[in-house]
Amino acid sequence: MASIQTRRDFLKVLGNGVMVSAVLPSFLASCASKGTEAGEGHRMVNMYDDDKNYLVAQLKRFTHVHQQMQKSDRMRCEIECMKIQYPLMFCEVEPGDLFAGRAKYPPVCLSPQAFDSGGYCISVGAMSKLESDPELSAEARADVREMIGYWSQESSRARMRKVFPPKMAEVLYSDNWTSDPLCGAPLDRLSGTQCDYDKLCRLGIDGLRKEIESCLSSGKGTPENIEFWKSSLIALDLFSEMALWYAGHVAEMVEKASGIRKAELKKIEESLRHIAVAKPETLHEAIQLVFLWAVMSGSINYGRMDEYLGDLYVNDLAAKRITEEDAIAMLSSLWTLIDSRKTTWDARVIVGGKGRRNETAADKFAYVAMETTKRVRGVIPQFTLRFSSGQDPRLYETALDVIGTGNPYPMLYNDDVIIPAVMNAFRVPYEEAVNYLPFGCGEYILYHRSVGTPSGVINLAQILSLTLHKGVNFTTGRREGIPSERYDGMQTFDDIMRCYKENVEHYVEQLAYHEKLEYDTIGCEAPYFYLSLLFDDCISRGKPVFDGGVRYLGGTLEAYGNTNTADSFAAIRKLVCDEKKLTLDQMVKILDADFEGYEKERMWMLDAPKYGNDDDYADALRVEVDSHICGFTREMAQKAGMHSYLIVIINNNANVTMGEQTPATPDGRKAYTFLANANASTGGADKNGITAYLNSIVKPDITIHAGAVQNMAFSKETFNTYREKTKALLSAYFGNGGAQAMINCMGRGDLQAAMEHPERYQNLIVRVGGFSAKFVDLPRSTQLEILSRTLY
């Protein structure tokens, strides 16, 4: 065998089918003779194993690279860190897996979204646990302590906090929204990316390389552009190295396997070797390529899967390489791998809708994907169907059949309504808006054209409480929000609404500036190559995704408590202004007592008009609350320096978490209990039936935000026995402007029974808000919130 001197030699030999163990000694000897570290920085034959001293040594090397390079050469820093990270991150192929790619982030890593942060991240909890591991040597333990100290100051999140302007630091004084009673809080992450996996499957690694080389040979570009293109080629080499490294490990498993499992592992090995150098030619190769790229990039959503896998699926069927059952087996394994990443609030897989380049083939894939979802019946991926009046109606019918089995998927998105809404909200033409995709809990993004990380939360019910207490946080006694003189003479309904709106704007303004600051700091600390190479227009511009590369740089802000706030205004108007049963001071006193001794007055508040009953007295106030915050937030985009900045009215259990920090509200809600879910009515408040409820939830303007979600709960008896009536009901809802529906379909009494006998309901999956979960795994407070919802 020829001498192996360089990484290129190493890749070439692995590409010819040689196992890692056969060539690693020669490569390591070459590195040692040159005075470099073994394997140019990582132990190639080791995955994330139980050797904690080795893990610490690699984390120390990762930290050293960051210390030496990040401020002077961010592009090389990312590549060198990823060389160390990927062998620590990727795990062995487990029994039953049909693809490689299980992964777990090491406790210090680079990712757009890890450990509730983005960029260069640390899990202090995991590092502290590592420090106490009895197997660690004294030297390794000291290294861990030193790294905790370093990263507490030099993580991307910590470095961003150091450059908060004074007003931002004052207004956004805490990000601990899960336990502090905050009106608004920043989130530090770069989430919601939707990579162009169709381009990846059409071009492969070699095609991407040729596109970059074409830019380099054009003779155009600044020195910074040229550096980006050259570094991108190195990043592609690193991806190929990773795939071949993985293939070598799988080859060793092949040698030990037999029968069907041997053939399965051999196919994994062959796909890994193929995608390292060429575009995928089969469904198996494409799935393997996409999943590995997703893990390397840190992206946790999976785009329009029917578009990028549809052609290969159809071709495989035509060539008799696979059957439909083979495809279902592959997708079942993929669904399991997606679930293994534990990205509960993301993991979107999209099928259907307008704008696909290969609708016929894509639809055929969509059917097999729905069948897989029906059989696997998992919490994730968050399987989503886009539909329109012009597409094959059988897709929608099949979706209802799957939902009728008690599966919360697919979620339904109405293109006929959403595309025009996105055109207005994002200020883009139809050709761009047709590529909208929901990610995460329901936020819209323009597929591989825009980013819009939700990097802030705002609690409107908390802001109303602050307003009623004239700038004093009831729970903490802290004075915050607008200046106290703005409350002078606050007595009328219009006065209260004015002060409330000024407070909302006070927080939204700083959250918008924070979003842009996040892009300018965390977003610019690394080029995030594996995102940049699959986002328009990073390669052509020669710039990283968050640093001038992406076509549309946007942001989103998560709003909570909209319904409680609107219903509270309805109670104030009715009881204080119209009927004069209470003065404003009396109402505030009752709220401060959490209704203790004021049961009659609480019933007045509970009986006041509520959103969700097709009653314009309440619904008009919900429209006003939404229109104000959505409109003001949308106008902050240009001031903050982004293409878009939009509210999202979604839910990721934050209605429960933030409600537990929110005092009593005038809608009759008790202190420190859950808030209403997203665009839905307060649980049990929709008393006029399903038609009235659906008429209410289409009233807020959907053309000024980036997505709102609504849950609907049907009994299996209603949904299945009266299917034609249910279809007519949903058809009327979507025809009246309904954008989206997440449907829970369950037997009457199932939820209560599951709380009493959880062992009997281990497979009861429910739609919580922006995510699904096994009902028995949810906290009791969340179970109670779901139980409060009306079951039709």
Which residues are covered by each model-predicted region?
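Short, Lys/Glu-rich amphipathic helical modules
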Residues: 250-264
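Conserved catalytic cores of very large enzyme subunits
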Residues: 37-229, 260-267, 279-792
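Generic start-of-chain signal for non-secretory N-termini
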Residues: 2-5, 35-39
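Extended non-globular scaffold/tether segments
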Residues: 230-241
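N-terminal export signals
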Residues: 3, 9-32
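Non-transmembrane amphipathic alpha-helical segments
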Residues: 205-219, 243-254, 272
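Extracytoplasmic/secretory soluble proteins
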Residues: 272-280
